[in-house]
A protein has these predicted regions:
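Catalytic-core elements of nucleic-acid end-processing and repair enzymes
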Residues: 1-146
């Protein structure tokens, strides 16, 4: 279904409202890092990935709700200028659990560790100390999988 906008300002307002759910929290020479707070933002910024919370089928809402139930925070790293960070990955998802643990995924939905992501040393996420987070892929067997 195509949406027709009566005026350009209507389109601009629509785009701004969708972006309100994804906040740019850090920008480096390589990355733009977004805090993702809604399913709509996850689908928009996670486009062209295999992340279950960013897909276009009906299951993405289920997975999103399961993660939210656990109080998980989502951050998407998106490369600038098509910089190829690792193989073909230009996007990474980082989930933060209780500001103690993390899981990270490449575009193909494979687990990665933070130190495997080029340029992660320059990434600053407000309120999160990436250096002290422990890698804990808890959701492989215990619950939903990103």
């Amino acid at each position: 279904m195509k949406i027709k906008y009566q005026e350009k300002k209507d389109l601009v307002q629509e785009l701004k409202s969708k972006d309100a759910c994804a906040k740019l929290v850090c920008e480096t020479d390589i990355w733009k890092i977004y805090s993702i707070t809604t399913l709509e933002a996850s689908k928009k910024y996670g486009r062209d990935t295999k992340w279950c919370i960013s897909g276009t089928d009906n299951t993405n809402n289920y997975y999103w709700q399961q993660y939210i139930k656990y109080g998980i925070k989502f951050y998407f790293l998106i490369t600038k200028n098509n910089y190829n960070a690792r193989g073909n990955d230009s996007k990474y998802a980082i989930i933060i659990i209780d500001n103690k643990y993390y899981e990270a995924f490449d575009q193909q939905d494979n687990h990665v560790k933070l130190n495997d992501i080029i340029g992660i040393d320059n990434v600053v996420i407000p309120g999160v100390n990436l250096a002290t987070l422990q890698y804990k892929p808890m959701f492989i067997n215990e619950g939903p999988h990103l």
